[in-house]
């Protein structure tokens, strides 16, 4: 059995999950980590027995024995330079979404990975959620026939929304609905998006932060086969809401309908101290004693296996770029009040990039 050595850049919430998952995997020999928070760096190094622990990610790229790098760093503006440097160093790369901030950056990463013959994948973890995988299967095997109506609505709590929105100027489309856009495009392959219309709604987030941050964003996407669908996302659930993330999915086809309640109401905890809570309701998931509840561990194992066993990755750079172009178009549409046609013209790309 071939073992590989993994480097993890950024060991916060998601990076920590991926680091611990790698530590438990028999295909992984050594773990090397880079983290700018020295307290967290020391904590994770002790927890996983890291071979290298550094505050400078470039140190990992100089280690020839590292086969692959997982980039879980924030803010999102760091994604492109870190991924570019890792690919140039000859490392296979797993990169958290978004793939980049500008489409030209995404194109450069995709081309570089191909040139170097390296695995390059993006963290769209919901593809590894069994409920979502079931929807994909039901479409592929014809259970519900040809899709004619699709709706996905996702909302997270206000406290988590402030944390995410405060990192970088990205919209609910870019930071929340991005997962659902990827999911629907995956289900509808090989159809491609050709038109995007979007509107945003303001309220609690702008009032509480003072920034130009919408509470919700709704997106209608038209595909090249004529089908249109709606994706909505927001981050303003009340602070007392008992879970982190709540999602509703509708797929109606010519031969059936499939509804998915991913609001995490299946396990309800109520205590005198904290009131009602819905455990295991985060999008990445969480460790529960001996087992991991959620998609992120499966996703991490998938990448490790792809590198160690030379398998194809499930999420390609091209697919992540497509999602990025659509949420950029959604933001432009919300700003102008008009539909936006794809591919995005050069002048619109310049406007989107400020």
Q: What are the residue ranges of the model-derived segments?
A:
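N-terminal Rossmann-like dinucleotide-binding module
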Residues: 1-48, 72, 184
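A contiguous active-site-proximal alpha/beta segment in oxidoreductase catalytic domains
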Residues: 2, 100-163, 170
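Hydrophobic residues in well-ordered beta-strands that form the structural core
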Residues: 94-95, 120-122, 231, 260
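Rossmann-like dinucleotide-binding domain that binds NAD(P)(H)
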Residues: 160-244, 318
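NAD(P)-dinucleotide binding in Rossmann-like oxidoreductases
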Residues: 209, 224-298
